């Protein structure tokens, strides 16, 4: 499981002209990709990492500040563009495998006490954010 984590000062996701998820103020925008061997245990591990990673201001975490997270599925995180001119998606898990695992990341975050907004799985989304720093890290579990 792979996540691109961005420290933000507000973020939102729009589907078909409707805002389906948004966070205000300091928090994290998290793009989550799932591969074939990912499990519910890895989803829980990723959730714990996202909740506790100290990348907000003054080396604080979302759990320290009760900061919100916007979690968005993104299968293209497992794209491979090393050969040719088009990426392949062979390493990305199919939707019926990936969707419940992204949902599990969200459920685990909420169980930890996090405020979580989400995108819509499989939809064409427009993501807007103010990257604070900029500060972006890749997390793999």
From Swiss-Prot:
Enzyme class: hydrolase
Record remark: domains: A Gly-cisPro motif from one monomer fits into the active site of the other monomer to allow specific chiral rejection of L-amino acids.
Highest classification ranks of the organism: Bacteria, Bacillati, Actinomycetota, Actinomycetes, Kitasatosporales
NCBIfam families tied to this protein: D-aminoacyl-tRNA deacylase (TIGR00256)
Compartments it resides in: Cytoplasm
Keywords annotated in UniProt: Cytoplasm, Hydrolase, RNA-binding, tRNA-binding
Family named by the database record: Belongs to the DTD family.
Gene3D superfamilies per record: D-tyrosyl-tRNA(Tyr) deacylase
BP GO annotations: D-amino acid catabolic process; tRNA metabolic process
Reaction equations catalysed: glycyl-tRNA(Ala) + H2O = tRNA(Ala) + glycine + H(+); a D-aminoacyl-tRNA + H2O = a tRNA + a D-alpha-amino acid + H(+)
Lineage: superkingdom: Bacteria
Protein name: D-aminoacyl-tRNA deacylase
CDD domains membership: Dtyr_deacylase
Subunit composition and interactions: Homodimer.
Organism: Streptomyces coelicolor (strain ATCC BAA-471 / A3(2) / M145)
Pfam families according to UniProt: Tyr_Deacylase (PF02580)
């Amino acid at each position: 499981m792979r996540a691109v984590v961005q420290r933000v000062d507000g973020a939102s996701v729009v589907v078909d002209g409707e805002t389906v998820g948004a966070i205000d103020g300091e928090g994290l925008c998290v793009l989550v990709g799932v591969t074939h061997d990912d499990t519910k245990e890895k989803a829980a591990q990723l959730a714990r990492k996202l909740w506790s990673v100290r990348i907000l201001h003054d080396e604080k975490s979302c759990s320290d500040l009760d900061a919100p997270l916007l979690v968005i599925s993104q299968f293209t995180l497992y794209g491979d563009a090393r050969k040719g001119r088009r990426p392949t998606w062979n390493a990305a898990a199919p939707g019926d495998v990936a969707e419940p695992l992204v949902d599990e990341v969200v459920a685990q975050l909420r169980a930890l006490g996090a405020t979580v907004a989400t995108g819509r799985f499989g939809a064409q989304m427009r993501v807007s954010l103010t990257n604070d720093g900029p500060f972006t890290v890749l997390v793999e579990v």
